[in-house]
Amino acid sequence: MQTYYTKWYSPSVGREMEIKVYGHAGRPVLFIPCQDGRFFDFENYRMTDAWAPWIESGQCMVFSIDTLDKETYSATYDPHDRIRRHEAWMNYIVREVAPFIQSMTNERNGWDGTPGIIAFGCSLGATHAANLYFRFPETFDGLLALSGIYTSEYGFPGYMDELVYANSPVDYLAGISPDHPFIRLYN
């Protein structure tokens, strides 16, 4: 299985962030590790074995990233500051990681344009994956979310503000209008 490791300084989060890519071609999949996870968890937890048939046959490329959960969902300091930090991580994914994924996917497959990305995660990674899919369906057009908690109550119990709401799929999907343009993208 072909792998590729890279890191760069992220202006969104203000530090270096690491990514590991598995595969040589195919549909892009963004893997978000379980709570407090790191980019190497996809490999360390032997997900590479489970995904090998699709990765090695060029059906998909998996991009595994770091989380900031230890500074956000798992931390205990002021919830407003924690959710602002989480939103910086979301911006890192949408503004930095997604374009990187789309560029590499195009290069490896000989494609043009902006290919949709499948968001994939387990546990809190599933929560983040679902949030990416529902908030940014123009970028994330597929979702595999296993055993997540899709409300912000888990990381921010008893606290709600605009950013917490924007990161709580149960809450914002309940408030979405049936004629919202995202509804068409979800289906």
Describe the role of every protein-language-model region.
Residues 1-187:
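Non-catalytic cap/lid and distal C-terminal segments of serine-dependent acyl enzymes
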